[in-house]
Amino acid sequence: MELEGQWWRGQLAADIHQALRYKELKLPSYKGQSPQLSLRRYFADLIAIVSNRFTLCPSARHLAVYLLDLFMDRYDISIQQLHLVALSCLLLASKFEEKEDSVPKLEQLNSLGCMTNMNLVLTKQNLLHMELLLLETFQWNLCLPTAAHFIEYYLSEAVHETDLHDGWPMICLEKTKLYMAKYADYFLEVSLQVAAACVASSRIILRLSPTWPTRLHRLTAYSWDFLVQCIERLLIAHDNDVKEANKQRGQAGPQSAQLSVFQTASQPSRPVHFQQPQYLHQTHQTSLQYRHPTSEQPSCQQIVSTTHTSSYTLQTCPAGFQTSVQGLGHMQTGVGMSLAIPVEVKPCLSVSYNRSYQINEHYPCITPCFER
C-alpha cells in the first residue's frame, strides 16, 4: 500500500487500528497439521525471496505466508503443486495490498531461477484456477490482519525524544528511529504473532528506557505482562541468529573478526538460572558508573540479563544470548500461533550469557543479524 495505505499517518488511524484488532480476533485458527509442514520453511522463504525480488510491501509478504499456512493446514498438497500454491498466495496478497503495477506478471514469475531450475512453468489457466480455489477456501475474504499491518502504526510512537539510551538522553533521534525500524523488521520476520512485541524487543536491543512506556501501552492496548512471553522468544531467536553470525564470521578468519565492531567476548560465560517470566524483572548489576533513577518499567539491562557484566566503550547493546534451546532462525508463523519454531520454553531455563557486541552513541553499525 502506498499513500492510501499509510493509514497510521491519517486522522482515522486510531479507528482503523481498532477495526484491524477486531478483525484479528476473528482470524481463522492455524493448527499446524499439514502433512507437508516440514516444507513450510522452504516455501515461506520462497515467498520472501520473490517478494524482495519485486519489492513488495511487508504486509503483502506476511499475508501471503499466512494464506499459505491456512491453505496447507486444510489440504494435502504435492511438492510440485506447493510451488503453484505459494506463488498464487503471493499474487493474491500483492493484488490485495499493492498497486496494480507492482503485482508480479506471469512472465516474470516463470523467469525466476527457482522455476527454471525445477523445470516448472506456470500457465495463466493454472494460476486462475488456483487463485479461485484459494479465494473459495477463504470465503473471498483476504482482509486477514497480520503483525505487518500493525507494525508501522506502532513504530510511529516507538521512539520518542524523552526516551533514554542506556540511562542517558539520546544523541541522535533519527538514527535511533532508523535502527528501531530495522530491528522491528527483523523481529517481524521471526514471528507474526504480535507486532507490539517486535517493537518492545527492538527497544530492548537498543537499550531504550523505559522499555514499554505508557504511550506504547496506550497506543497498542497491550500491557507489558501480556507481551513478556512473546518478547522472550523473539530475543532467544535473535540471539541464536547473532551467535550463528558470529560463528560464520569467526570461520572467515581471525583478521576479519578483529575488524568487526561486534566481537565475541573472551571471558567465559556464566550460567544464570531464572524462571519465566520473572527473570525479566530481576535486578541487574553492570559496570556502569552511573544509574538512572527508577522509572515506570525495568531498564533494558534488567530485562535482557540478570547478573552479567558488560564491557563499555561508550554505550553497548546486548548480544550472544546462548541457550540450550535451539531455534530455527527466520521462521515466519501464522498469526494464531505462538511461534512456528520447535522452541519449548520450560518454566525454568539454564542460560549462559556472553554479551559484548557494541553500538556507540551514534549507532553507526548494524548487528550481525542484518548481515546474513
Curated annotation (Swiss-Prot):
Key words of the record? Cyclin
GO CC, any one term: cyclin-dependent protein kinase holoenzyme complex
Keyword Calcium included in the entry's annotation: no
Q: Which family does it belong to?
A: Belongs to the cyclin family.
Protein name, UniProt field: Cyclin-J
Give the Gene Ontology MF terms in alphabetical order.
cyclin-dependent protein serine/threonine kinase regulator activity
Q: Which domain of life is it from?
A: Eukaryota
Q: What Pfam families would the database entry show?
A: Cyclin_C, Cyclin_N
Q: Which residue ranges does the record assign to the Cyclin N-terminal domain?
A: 15-143
Q: List the disulfide bonds.
A: none
One of the GO biological process terms: G1/S transition of mitotic cell cycle
